[in-house]
């Protein structure tokens, strides 16, 4: 298996969303899993369609199919269901790991005090 592609368990989760059968009007369809691997490659690399490796299929066919799936709402439906099923309990952003630029230390303070102007009225009342 290619490290850029879907794992077997990932493919099984999204297999039901993939339209089409095994044979199209003009012959055998392109492998759906290979097509999704091509989309993942595009998302990860940020490359152009023409840069798609040949092992993932003809870039013109992948591009056409991508726009067909967008029009049919296949990818929207797939992402909506996967987002609902996502286990985000483990997800946490820890600011001790994230480094900020030295000039990103904070906003400038207003003259005459440490509190933002919008909070001054709240403290007085």
Swiss-Prot record:
The keyword DNA repair does not apply. It comes from Sinorhizobium fredii (strain NBRC 101917 / NGR234). To transposase of insertion sequence IS6501. GO terms for biological process: transposition. InterPro entries: IS402-like_dom (IPR025161), Transposase_6_like (IPR052909). The keyword ATP-binding does not apply. This is Uncharacterized protein y4sN. Keywords: Plasmid, Transposable element, Transposition. The lineage of its organism: Bacteria, Pseudomonadati, Pseudomonadota, Alphaproteobacteria, Hyphomicrobiales.
């Amino acid at each position: 298996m290619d490290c850029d592609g879907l794992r077997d368990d990932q493919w099984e989760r999204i297999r039901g969303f993939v339209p089409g059968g095994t044979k199209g009007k003009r012959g055998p369809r392109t492998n759906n899993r290979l097509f999704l691997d091509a989309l993942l490659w595009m998302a990860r690399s940020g490359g152009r369609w023409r840069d798609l490796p040949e092992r993932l299929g003809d870039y013109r066919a992948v591009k056409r199919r991508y726009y067909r799936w967008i029009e049919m709402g296949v990818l929207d439906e797939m992402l909506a269901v996967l987002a609902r099923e996502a286990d985000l309990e483990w997800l946490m952003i820890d600011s001790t790991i994230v480094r900020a630029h030295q000039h990103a230390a904070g906003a400038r303070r207003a003259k005459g005090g440490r509190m933002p102007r919008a909070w001054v009225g709240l403290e007085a009342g």
